[in-house]
UniProtKB/Swiss-Prot annotation:
Xref: HAMAP family: Ribosomal_bS20
Keyword rRNA-binding: yes
Gene assigned in the entry: rpsT
GO molecular function: small ribosomal subunit rRNA binding; structural constituent of ribosome
Family the entry assigns: Belongs to the bacterial ribosomal protein bS20 family.
Protein name per the record: Small ribosomal subunit protein bS20
Record GO biological process: translation
Pfam family of the protein (one): Ribosomal_S20p
Species this chain originates from: Novosphingobium aromaticivorans (strain ATCC 700278 / DSM 12444 / CCUG 56034 / CIP 105152 / NBRC 16084 / F199)
One GO CC term on file: small ribosomal subunit
Length: 86
């Protein structure tokens, strides 16, 4: 158990950050899901628009430290390739 005031503060801060990061990650997943839904429907224009909206969200995840840059690069690459192949 945290005995020092600073350790207690870090626990509070970590809980807040975990909630914020979870919300950010959920938002990113939603944008990616929109692209995948459009791809499953076979609608190229909708998929391209959804991808255009998802890319800045993914990049923001890297900037905020929620996702690793290589993970985002891989996701963007795969989604872009799938949209282009429609």
């Amino acid at each position: 158990m945290a005995n020092t005031p600073q350790a207690r503060k870090r626990i509070r801060r970590n809980e807040r950050r975990a909630e914020i990061n979870g919300n950010r990650l959920s938002r990113i997943r939603t944008f990616v899901k929109k692209v995948e839904t459009a791809l499953a429907g076979g609608d190229k224009t909708a998929a391209a628009e959804a991808l255009k909206a998802a890319q800045p969200e993914l990049a923001r995840g890297v900037a905020r430290g929620v996702l690793h840059k290589n993970t985002v690069a891989r996701k963007m690459s795969r989604l872009t390739k799938r949209v282009a192949s429609l």
